[in-house]
Amino acid sequence: QFDAYNSKSKEDSSFIMFSKSNDQSLTWSEPLRISKHGGDCIDDDNTVEGAVPAIGPNGEIYVTWTGPMGLVFQKSLDGGSTWMESEIVLQEQFGGWSLEVPGIYRANGLPILKCDLSNGPNQGNLYLNWCDQKGGEDNTDSWIIKSTDGGVTWSDRIRVNQDGSNKHQFFTWMTIDQSSGYLYFVYYDRRNYDDTQTDVYLSASRDGGKTFVDTKISEKPFIPSAEMFFGDYLNIDAVDGQIRPIWPSMKDKKIKLHVALISEKGLKK
């Protein structure tokens, strides 16, 4: 929530609010502020935003977002009635969440939170995926941390993209196939080029985020233009071994949407 969007006044703040519906979205509960610490309203690195919820196997509600404190985490164990006294900081987000990537009008590195609800060995695991520039301003990467105890403790960060090229990987998004517990990530990737040519890659993890295998899924690269707003997110879903990443590409300042029809059986192992 913004007191006044784009306001530069120190009197205006941004916060994270929570509301829920018990009747299929017909009515909603009174919004409850769940971020103890706020940010500014400029819609930049010091703004609190990018909240993504995830539901645990026993109805736990988990939320992550980012802002001046870095990547933070909140949770409720009673359906959203009460929350932790304050959000906890999970990671520094190097370069902030509003990243500078050549050829991109605005490159968000906002976090994505998912929970394993499968019947597999990693049921209940929380996974947090985001992009930042820990490797330097010319080396954006996709990262993940995980929790196996409901967000009490978290692993060290692990890099999702396995190229080691010191190039940009950005606009990450992830999903979990709840039939298997496998993790899938989609992101833009420039590992193969020295300019702004951009491919799309998918990474898969079949061991709860310990190891990853990369696959290029775009047929050919495209060259974006920083003069044109390109959107803020990619997306991906996976059900019963069928994986559907979706992304935009750009040619001559015209945007096209793409979806890939991918089967787990056909991916590199």
Briefly describe each language-model feature range.
Residues Q1-K269:
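Extracellular, repeat-based ectodomains that mediate carbohydrate processing or recognition
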